[in-house]
Regions:
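Conserved short alpha-helical segments that host acidic/polar catalytic motifs at enzyme active sites
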Residues: 1-240, 244-245, 259-260, 269-280, ...
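Short, glycine-/Ser/Thr-/acidic-enriched flexible segments
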Residues: 9-13, 39-41, 49-50, 72-74, ...
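Short helix-capping/linker segments at secondary-structure and domain boundaries
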Residues: 12-13, 133-140, 163-164, 405-414, ...
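Glycine-rich oxoanion-binding loops at beta->alpha junctions
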Residues: 64, 68-81, 261-274, 300-335, ...
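Acidic/histidine-rich
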Residues: 152-182, 441-465, 500-502, 507
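Active-site phosphate/pyrophosphate-binding segments
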Residues: 253-285, 375-492, 502-503, 566-583
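Glycine-rich phosphate-binding loops that contact phosphosugars or nucleotide phosphates
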Residues: 276-422, 449, 496-540, 558, ...
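Generic C-terminus detector
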Residues: 542-583
Length: 583
């Protein structure tokens, strides 16, 4: 979840490191730091806070070899002491790390017996000192240390007097490439210059990066030849383009994203390989985390209703340890915006080990998940920077819908649903009175039935993530089984009712809330009876399977506007990071 950058060049790359870190800040923003070679010495500067806290230093530094880091704390509280880069006890090497070392306490105790004095609370300092104690050249030292580590890591190591960076990878993404007058390592290809050549390190691989060369090694330190691709990422995707926050920009990009998906998948060949995976399949297990899990719930339901398939959605961190989840003739579908979600990747690896076919629905076709899966479907959402996912959720759901329709009817044409993109433009604005209501509430509830119950979960998650309000989503029928005890005068309850067949029952639940003093914010199709609603958000008329793609947009906007009204940064909520690359 941390962001790693390293550059070795003939030029001063201090500012390049800073700019690259800014692009990685979505991965964590508890603290930031940089370490560079200054003659034969290593100079380190780090601060608690966002990346901008090291800007002045980077503007004035003169490093041609440097590593840098933006941190999301796992071991040790966010503070300057625990910020990366972390230096070894004698100062021989300095390290930046993304991941979790599970056996760090055992190694730490052994090192303390050898006289090492630790200055931080991090697991990273253990790795740094372990490397220092090993014998051999720089690569061999890193390799020997990594062999003793249990857990996940991407490491970039700088040694005193060596104009090179040693890289190691296990279960945490890391890329190498050529740019900035030399060579570079980074956690995300966003950091590279456009048209730069890059490749991903695979699990167990190492690399030594100098200004003139990138040499990749296998787990046994045999030299590996790899093909490099050209960066084609548009810089515009990571610019605000007139918006104050990325989350606002990304919500407003949803109509264009939906339009692109409809256009891209009009070409059935782009989805044909995924369709073939369903041949002979009796069970579908959809595996994901967070917002992607909610999209997986939508996907399971659309496959059940459209095809009559046995389909279930699972939280990835639980699926790995469930008993009796291995069945014959099963397809696993992994869902992830980044394609690097650690728990989903580990669950996917388990599925492969047990003979499952694996389909990935992702937003990054260069990700670890794409390489793991038999087939990957692109959600075409473009880069999503805001920590709280918005346009990617809508995109995942639409890809599931299109896949289900193609599986049911090979003659399906995506332009049958092209009005969806235009309809989504109609629900981007919300009543400021609703925002004021949520801002002043201590807790918020969301209820719905069937597809709407899934939207309720996602709406609650958005409010929770960025406004820090207590927010929960429930199936409407569950109100009487506990939740009504929490409803009193003035409690806001979002009632989602976009399915005509469920509307009367859902409104009956709304009446129960109203009778206890709750305030009803109804989201429904324009033609539906509004009953006891205090506030109404109308969505355009649409089939029940597509209505959730419309109803979720005002929920995202309300969450965004509420966070902004409170004074929170919607793009960077406390304690969270965009890409969850640790378990």
């Amino acid at each position: 979840m941390c962001g790693i950058v390293g550059i070795v060049s003939k030029n001063n790359i201090s500012k390049n490191c800073y700019v690259a870190l800014e692009k990685l800040e979505y991965r964590g923003y508890d603290s930031a730091g940089i370490a560079g070679l200054n003659g034969n010495k290593i100079q380190i500067f780090k601060k608690q806070g966002r990346v901008q806290c090291i800007k002045e230093f980077c503007d004035n530094a003169n490093f041609k070899t440097a590593i840098a880091h933006t941190r999301w704390a796992t071991h040790g509280k966010p503070c300057e002491e625990n910020a990366h880069p972390i230096v070894s006890s004698t100062g021989e090497c300095v390290i930046v790390h993304n991941g979790i070392i599970e056996n760090y306490l055992e190694i730490k105790q052994n090192l303390e017996k050898c006289g090492v004095v630790f200055k931080t609370q991090t697991d990273t300092e253990v790795v740094c000192n372990l490397i220092e104690k090993e014998t051999g050249n720089t690569l061999e030292k890193v390799k020997k240390a990594c062999d003793k580590l249990i857990g996940s890591f991407a490491l970039a190591v700088l040694f005193k007097g060596k104009n090179e960076i040693v890289i190691a990878r296990k279960s945490s993404p890391i890329y190498v490439g050529s740019c900035f007058g030399g060579n570079m390592v980074a956690s995300d290809i966003l950091c590279f210059e456009k048209n730069a050549k890059y490749c991903a390190l695979e699990d167990g691989e190492f690399a030594v990066v100098s200004k003139s060369k990138i040499q990749i090694y296998s787990s046994t330190l045999k030299k590996v030849k790899k093909s490099f691709k050209t960066i084609e990422t548009s810089g515009e995707e990571i610019e605000l383009c007139g918006f104050e926050f990325f989350m606002e920009k990304e919500i407003n990009e949803t109509p264009a994203v939906l339009k692109r998906i409809i256009t891209e998948y009009q070409d059935k060949e782009k989805i044909q390989s995924a369709i073939k995976l369903f041949e002979g399949v009796k069970n579908v297990e959809i595996i994901a985390c967070g917002t992607a899990y909610h999209a997986g719930r939508y996907g399971a339901k659309i496959l059940q209703e459209t095809l009559g398939l046995s389909a279930s959605a699972h939280i990835a961190s639980e699926f790995r340890y469930d008993k009796n989840n291995i069945k014959e003739n099963t397809l696993a579908i992994l869902v992830s915006q980044s394609g690097e979600t650690a728990d989903t990747l580990r669950a996917g690896e388990l599925c492969k080990q047990n003979g499952y076919k694996v389909l990935a629905i992702i937003n990054s076709m260069e990700s670890s998940m794409s390489r793991l899966a038999d087939v990957s479907l692109n959600i075409f959402a473009g880069k999503e920077i805001g920590v709280a996912s918005t346009k990617a959720y809508s995109a995942m759901c639409l890809v599931f819908y299109i896949l289900a329709r193609y599986l049911k009817n090979s003659n399906f044409d995506t332009f049958e649903i092209e009005k969806l993109a235009d309809q989504s433009k109609e629900v981007l604005k919300v009543d400021s009175k609703i925002v004021d209501l949520i801002k002043n509430a201590s807790r918020v509830f969301f209820i719905g039935r069937q597809f709407d119950s899934i939207s309720s979960l996602e709406g609650a998650l958005k409010v929770k993530e960025i406004s820090y309000k207590s927010a929960e989503g429930y199936p409407a029928g569950e109100l009487k089984h506990g939740t009504l005890a929490l409803i009193n005068n003035g409690t806001p309850v979002f009632v989602l009712s976009t399915d005509k067949n469920m509307h009367d029952k859902t409104m009956a639940a709304a009446e129960e809330v109203r009778s206890r003093g709750g305030i009803i914010i109804l989201i429904s199709q324009k033609s539906f009876d509004k009953g006891c609603a205090d506030f109404v958000i109308n969505i355009p008329e649409s089939e029940k399977e597509l209505a959730p793609l419309l109803s979720v947009i005002p929920l995202q906007t309300i969450a965004f506007e509420t966070a902004k009204a409170i004074g929170n940064n919607p793009d960077k909520p406390r304690n969270l990071a965009k890409s969850v690359t640790v378990e």
